[in-house]
From Swiss-Prot:
Residues binding Mg(2+) 2: E288, N290
Family, similarity comment: Belongs to the D-alanine--D-alanine ligase family.
Gene name as annotated: ddl
Gene Ontology molecular function: ATP binding; D-alanine-D-alanine ligase activity; metal ion binding
Pathway: Cell wall biogenesis; peptidoglycan biosynthesis
Subcellular location: Cytoplasm
Enzyme Commission number(s) of this protein: 6.3.2.4
UniProt organism field: Parabacteroides distasonis (strain ATCC 8503 / DSM 20701 / CIP 104284 / JCM 5825 / NCTC 11152)
Annotated positions binding ATP: 149-204
Name of this chain's protein: D-alanine--D-alanine ligase
Record note on cofactor: Binds 2 magnesium or manganese ions per subunit.
């Protein structure tokens, strides 16, 4: 009998549109000969499954079940593709753990850690991972322009500490723009990072590990036509994404090994993507970890899967079956 898979999308952040696009991508990637697929919407004001008719039917939060044609149906697995809260920050993972639902992503603690960019990067720094100098602010805290320039110089990036898809991010090149950029970032959350700008080549590397198999994908080089890799560049085509990246074999292997090492340090699960900047000295600097990476047809992970000569359908099956098997043995 085919398993019922919930592709869980939505969320309560600015990234909901991207989440829904990723859900459509995942729906097209998963093997429909093996699984029954449903898109489930999880938002603050709606938990619902989208039926084939387009009707939204409510989810019973007690066990994440739903009714179809009067019949109660239960899910066997949840593929989480919510970018932002509650699917990327550990909240949904904690709920699924409580009800015993297998799911695709990192667990609650790892998801919460990686969602907090500042804390995650400084945690990894203790393991020898190179990171950019940065300043962290909570809402209500202030900092003078002079202190920012003294500690970080210019240019800098100002961004929400717990957001993605470049919402609320500003590249600041002049002192007069520092405070407006901080205010903009606080519009997306209660914590903000000011980070030293590093000039270099931006690359990203995907990875997943299942029992008996480790897959680290070819790197993608990100060349944006905009000031930086912002929302417009990511989703409106203002970027060249080159897979494999135009860097040396030695540097590629170094970054792939570092990505695999970060996966193990974190105790990650499912697909992750790690972003780096390579400065002139050639030593990669960690930018951030993505534990629910975008999965539209043109997103980095599908590109890297193709470049590796793999079938995205097989990758999805690996992740689903490994978690189903592991849950049975727990």
């Amino acid at each position: 009998m085919k398993k019922n898979i919930a592709i869980v999308a939505g969320g309560d952040s600015s990234e909901i549109v991207i989440s829904l696009k990723s859900a459509d991508g995942i729906y097209s990637f998963i093997d429909k000969d093996k699984y029954n697929l449903y898109i489930a919407i999880v938002k603050r004001d709606e938990w619902a499954v989208i039926l084939p008719s387009g009707e939204h039917t409510p989810i019973d939060k007690n066990d994440f079940s739903f009714k179809e044609n009067g019949v109660t149906r239960h899910f066997d697995f949840a593929y989480i593709t919510i970018h932002g809260t509650p699917g990327e920050d550990g909240r949904l993972q904690g709920y699924f753990d409580m009800i015993g639902m297998p799911y695709s992503s990192c667990g609650m603690l790892v998801s919460a850690l990686t969602f907090n960019k500042y804390v995650c990067n400084h945690y990894l720094k203790d393991f020898g991972v190179k990171i950019a100098a940065s300043i962290h602010l909570f809402k209500g805290e202030t900092i003078t322009d002079e202190e920012v320039v003294t500690r970080l110089g210019l240019p800098i990036f100002v961004k929400p500490n717990d957001g993605g898809s470049s919402f609320g991010v500003t590249k600041v090149k002049e002192v007069s723009a520092i405070q407006p950029a901080i205010a903009k970032a606080f519009g997306e959350g209660r914590e903000v990072i000011l980070e030293r700008f590093i000039d270099g080549t931006e690359v990203t590397c995907g990875c997943y590990k299942v029992e008996g198999k480790e897959v680290v994908f070819p790197l993608t080089e990100v060349v944006t036509n905009n000031e930086f890799f912002d929302f417009d560049a990511k989703y409106n085509g203002q970027v060249d994404e080159i897979t494999p990246a135009r860097i040396s074999t030695e540097l590629t292997e170094l970054i792939q090994c570092e990505t695999s090492r970060i996966y193990d340090i974190l105790g990650a699960k499912g697909l992750i993507r790690v972003d780096y900047i390579i400065p002139a000295d050639g030593e990669p600097v960690l930018l951030e970890i993505n534990t629910t990476p975008g999965m539209t047809a043109t997103s980095f992970i599908p590109q890297q899967v193709r470049a590796a000569g793999l079938d995205i359908k097989d990758v999805m099956t690996d992740i689903i079956e490994d978690e189903l098997k592991n849950r049975k043995t727990k």
